[in-house]
């Protein structure tokens, strides 16, 4: 992930913007400070950019900004690079037949072993969306089991 501070969010709402072209470095962009300003330096927006593959090149922050200029225009010129985190094995390999959601009777999004509910993207699909779905489904099942 590559992180930038910006004067304002490039997004009009709190969403994850996906690269649908299957080209380039960028997989998705989100602005965590659109959800909570506490995530960003004071008075700034925090831009989080997820890349495909491992990139150790010191020029990656500049290359990412060049690519995102096609998405957001000249505003990226004012973005300040904060840090780059290289996360090995960020997403698990997950072939469809190995997907745990196919083997659980409790429903999509979590596993139940004994009386323990297990959630996470590893129980749905290896993605941010998978993690959110899993958390929501697990919370709903837990509330139902409590009679709420």
What is each stretch, according to the model?
Residues 60-111:
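Flavin (FAD/FMN) cofactor-binding core of flavoprotein oxidoreductases
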Residues 131-148:
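Internal hydrophobic alpha-helix adjacent to the cofactor/substrate pocket in enzyme cavities
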Residues 48, 107-127, 131-136:
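Short FAD-binding loop at a beta-strand-to-alpha-helix junction that anchors the flavin cofactor
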Residues 1-60, 66-71:
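Mid-domain catalytic core of redox enzymes
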Residues 51-53, 86, 120:
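Active-site proximal loops enriched in glycine and acidic residues that flank catalytic Cys/His/Asp
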Residues 58-62, 129-132:
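Conserved strand-to-helix beginnings and helix N-cap segments that scaffold or border functional pockets
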Residues 38, 91, 125:
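Flexible, glycine-rich phosphate/dinucleotide-binding loops
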């Amino acid at each position: 992930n590559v992180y930038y501070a910006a004067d304002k969010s490039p997004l009009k709402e709190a969403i994850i913007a996906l690269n649908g072209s299957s080209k380039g470095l960028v997989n998705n962009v989100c602005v965590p400070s659109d959800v909570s300003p506490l995530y960003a330096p004071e008075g700034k927006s925090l831009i989080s950019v997820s890349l495909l593959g491992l990139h150790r090149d010191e020029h990656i922050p500049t290359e990412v900004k060049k690519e995102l200029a096609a998405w957001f225009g000249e505003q990226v010129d004012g973005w300040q690079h904060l840090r780059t985190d290289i996360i090995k094995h960020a997403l698990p390999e997950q072939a469809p037949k190995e997907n745990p959601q196919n083997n659980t009777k409790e429903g999509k999004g979590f596993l139940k072993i004994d009386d323990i509910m297990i959630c996470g993207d590893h129980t749905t699909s290896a993605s941010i969306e998978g993690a959110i779905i899993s958390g929501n489904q697990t919370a709903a099942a837990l509330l139902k089991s409590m009679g709420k």
